[in-house]
Every structure is written in C-alpha cells, then in structure tokens.
C-alpha cells in the first residue's frame, strides 16, 4: 500500500522503516526517512504483523467527480467501508459518498481494507446524504436503492450512467430519507436459506453487474487513471 501511495498525488511527508528492512521500491528523493527499532515501529503500527514499511501522508482526497458513484448510508463496519471502496475501484466506479455515521475513511482498518483504492477514487462527505442525492437527481443521475421490497435486480432494464448506487447500514438498511430519493428500487434474489447478504458482498455484486456491459464499462487494464471525464462536483459541507 505504501507503493500505491508513492504513485498517487497524495503528499508524502515521511517514510518509516523498521531496522533491517529494505523496501522493495526506490526511496523518493527529498522525503525524510526514519529508521525505527522493532519496539518503536510496533508502537506506531496498529497491525499485529507489520511489514516494516510505513508512510506519513497528508489527508488529501480527490473531490467527487465522474458519473458512477456508490453512496454509503451509515455503513459502520470499517472492513465493509474499505472493501466497498476497493470493489468500486475494481469495478470502474468514479467515486464514493460517505454519509454521516459511516466508519472514518482515514481509520487504519478502512485504509488497509481499501488496499490502495483510496488513492484512485474521488470522495464526498455530505452532512445530509439525502440532500446530495437530490442534487445528483437534478443533474440527471439515476439513484439506485437496494431494499427487500424492491424489484428483482436481474430483471431490470439497463441503466446507463450517470447513476449512484446506495448501500445501507448493516443492521437497518437504507434510512427512510435516503430511500425516498431513489429513482429505482431493487432487491437481490435469495434462492437459498440466507435472509440477507453482507453489505460489502451485496454492493460488490450490484456494482459489477451494473458495469458488465461494454457500453457502460470504462475499464482498460493496466492504465491509470481510469476515471470518467464527466465532472460532477458537490460542495463539501
């Protein structure tokens, strides 16, 4: 993940190395490098088995832009938030809206779970997610809600971009004010005995299916950035 940070436009303030560790990348010029003892490195790292390389970065994000977004409505598990961000990046989405009560994007577990995708996507942090969805609707976005009483997801007509997919809270689903902004309401079929899916799993299924058609997919292997050129920037409140 440190290598991903080096390749990004984030501001790198310092590199931390554990004694005896040789990084598998060239050290950037002009960046302070601190070599720490095992004890000190373990104290600054929150992982049980740190790899011995860490980076100090400025909290810098790309303002929301593009035409394919996922919106998180009080998704509280850090692993789910990070996994959804990683999957959105892999599927070819442009950005993520994190509403109130979501896990902190900059917590260590969320950061690790993104596996570097935080450096490639754009983000917004609305205080009122329903208001931002209303703004997106006014700009021509379809707003997709996943809910138990929705229409079968795989029976839908294709939905071209721009669109935003809402992912709800792990226990309570999508809140009523956010759900009210949906232009399309879907449910994933459950053919076995399970009552529901993990939020990140359900989001991943829907994101990949929304991007499966050639006219919707923008994914070009081994190129970066892969983002849409259509600007859609919401004010950060």
Set out the residue ranges of the language-model regions:
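Short, polar loop motifs at secondary-structure junctions
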Residues: 1, 18-23, 59, 148-150, ...
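N-terminal positively charged helical leader segments and presequences
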Residues: 1-45, 219-237
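Short loop/helix-cap segments at secondary-structure boundaries that form the rim of catalytic
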Residues: 23-30, 62-65, 177-180
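Active-site/ligand-binding-proximal alpha/beta "capping" segment
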Residues: 144-194, 198
């Amino acid at each position: 993940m440190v290598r991903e940070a080096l390749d990004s436009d984030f501001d790198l303030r310092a590199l931390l190395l554990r004694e005896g560790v040789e990084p598998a990348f060239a050290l950037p010029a002009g960046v302070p490098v601190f070599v720490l003892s095992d004890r000190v490195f373990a104290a600054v790292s929150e992982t049980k088995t740190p790899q011995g390389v860490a980076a100090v970065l400025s909290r810098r994000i790309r303002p929301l832009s593009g035409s394919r977004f996922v919106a998180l409505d009080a998704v509280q598990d850090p692993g789910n938030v990070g996994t959804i961000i990683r999957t959105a990046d892999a599927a070819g989405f442009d950005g993520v809206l994190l509403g109130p009560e979501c896990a902190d994007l900059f917590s260590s577990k969320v950061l690790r779970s993104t596996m570097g995708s935080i450096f490639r996507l754009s983000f917004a942090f609305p205080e009122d997610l329903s208001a931002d969805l209303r703004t997106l609707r006014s700009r021509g976005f379809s707003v997709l809600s996943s809910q138990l009483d929705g229409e079968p997801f795989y029976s839908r007509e294709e939905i071209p971009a721009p669109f935003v997919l809402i992912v709800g809270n792990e226990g309570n689903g999508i809140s009523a004010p956010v759900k009210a902004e949906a232009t399309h309401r879907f449910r994933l079929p459950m053919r076995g005995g399970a009552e529901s899916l993990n939020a990140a799993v359900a989001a991943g299924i829907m994101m990949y299916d929304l991007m499966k058609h050639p006219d919707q997919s923008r994914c070009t292997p081994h190129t970066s950035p892969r983002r849409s050129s259509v600007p859609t920037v919401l004010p950060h409140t």
